[in-house]
Every structure is written in structure tokens, then in C-alpha cells.
């Protein structure tokens, strides 16, 4: 009687081919995914890599603010923090604006529906009532699947999702969030950190000369 090993396994050939095809498909999928991550990463590792809309609906690249300190704020017109917060933002921008610093305001209506105005109306309201000169962008969503990508980056990188209006996030010249403040925190709590960051920017520019 011939040994069992002498009989050929006829079905092994097609199975091996199917396995090879499936393996190739899996490897291709993995490679495409890794390539996608490689190309996406440079566009999402900095706040300044995003584009947003201004109050008039025009596209603005945040790249123009790179190299400066930025205070990113979700603002609202009909909030109990509106008056004090806009005064604080105006003072900070007035004091540090000429020295590599910007306040970047993003209106949002998701917190107590306290921003019913249109983007243009918000800009006009802030200019007329508080004399602000810093950029006020298009009204956005911060919470949920329709959140503005630029602000979602702020939230994800800081691990601090705003719970109300006028949360303030300090972004360094490279586009990373380094500090945040809740709406009830006073100007005196923010000023030293902004001043320190601006001092570092000025010192670096002198060293690069």
C-alpha cells in the first residue's frame, strides 16, 4: 500500500493563489492607508495649517498668523461674559498687537444660543460697541460632527473642550496650544503668559539676525 504522502493535494494550488491575492489586497490597503497618514500629517499638526472663512465668507489661510502668538476665542454677543471678555480681548490686542500677537475670534451659537447674529453682524457689533480691531471670523460650530476643523484641532490638541462662550486658547508661533483660560478668569491671569511668549518670540528673532 502506497503511503498517504504520495497522493498529490490537488486543491492546494487554487487555495494558495486565492490566499496570495487576498494577502496582496490587504498589503495594498495597508500601504495606501500609511501613505494617506503620511501626507495628511503635515496639514494637521499646526493650527496655522488650516483655512477658515472671515466674517464676509472669504477664505483666509491661518498661515498668515504663523510665527506669532495667537489667542483663539469662541465669542458671543448675548452672553453674561460678553462685556467683560470683549474688554479684556481689546486690551490684550491693544497692548501686545504691535508685538507679534493676535486675538482670533470665532463666533459660535452653540452655548445657550447666545450668538444669534450673522457673522457680519457680529463683526459690526464688536467694532461699534467695543472698538475691537482684531479678526472676527465666520460663525462656526465647535461641538459635534460639523465642528470647524481649525477649532477642532484646538480642542483635540488641548484636550479641553469649551463648555461655554469665551474660552481662550493661547497658541504658540508653531501653531500648538500651550495654555487655556475659562471665561471667568481675569485679564491679569492671561497677560503674563502672553507677555512671556512674545518676549521669547522677540528674543528668537534677535538671535536669528
Curated annotation (Swiss-Prot):
SUPFAM superfamilies from the UniProt entry: Thioredoxin-like
One Gene Ontology molecular-function label: glutathione peroxidase activity
N-acetylmethionine PTM sites in chain numbering: 1
Membrane protein topology class: Single-pass membrane protein
Catalytically driven reaction(s): 2 glutathione + H2O2 = glutathione disulfide + 2 H2O
Keyword Iron: no
Subcellular locations according to the entry: Membrane
Superkingdom assignment: Eukaryota
InterPro entries the UniProt entry points to: Glut_perox_Gpx7 (IPR013376), Glutathione_peroxidase (IPR000889), GPX_CS (IPR029760), Thioredoxin-like_sf (IPR036249)
Swiss-Prot/TrEMBL GO biological process terms: response to oxidative stress
GO annotation, cellular component aspect: membrane
Keywords linked to the UniProt accession: Acetylation, Membrane, Oxidoreductase, Peroxidase, Transmembrane, Transmembrane helix
Pfam families, A to Z: GSHPx (PF00255)
Protein known as: Probable glutathione peroxidase 8
Species assigned in the record: Mus musculus (Mouse)
Source taxonomy: Eukaryota, Metazoa, Chordata, Craniata, Vertebrata
Gene that this polypeptide is encoded by: Gpx8
Amino acid at each position: 500500500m502506497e503511503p498517504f504522502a504520495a497522493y498529490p493535494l490537488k486543491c492546494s494550488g487554487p487555495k494558495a493563489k486565492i490566499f496570495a491575492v487576498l494577502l496582496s489586497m490587504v498589503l495594498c490597503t495597508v500601504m495606501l492607508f500609511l501613505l494617506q497618514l503620511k501626507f495628511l500629517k503635515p496639514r494637521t499638526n499646526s493650527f496655522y495649517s488650516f483655512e477658515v472663512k472671515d466674517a464676509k465668507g472669504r477664505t483666509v489661510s491661518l498661515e498668515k498668523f504663523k510665527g506669532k502668538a495667537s489667542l483663539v476665542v469662541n465669542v458671543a454677543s448675548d452672553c453674561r461674559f460678553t462685556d467683560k471678555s470683549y474688554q479684556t480681548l481689546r486690551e490684550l490686542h491693544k497692548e501686545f498687537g504691535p508685538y507679534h500677537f493676535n486675538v482670533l475670534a470665532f463666533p459660535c451659537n452653540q452655548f445657550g444660543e447666545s450668538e444669534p447674529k450673522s457673522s457680519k453682524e457680529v463683526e459690526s457689533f464688536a467694532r461699534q460697541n467695543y472698538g475691537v480691531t482684531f479678526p472676527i471670523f465666520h460663525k462656526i460650530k465647535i461641538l459635534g460632527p460639523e465642528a470647524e476643523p481649525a477649532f477642532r484641532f484646538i480642542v483635540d490638541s488641548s484636550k479641553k473642550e469649551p463648555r461655554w462662550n469665551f474660552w481662550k486658547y493661547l497658541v504658540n508661533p508653531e501653531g500648538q496650544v500651550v495654555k487655556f483660560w475659562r471665561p471667568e478668569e481675569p485679564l491679569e491671569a492671561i497677560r503674563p503668559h502672553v507677555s512671556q511668549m512674545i518676549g521669547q518670540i522677540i528674543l528668537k528673532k534677535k538671535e536669528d539676525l
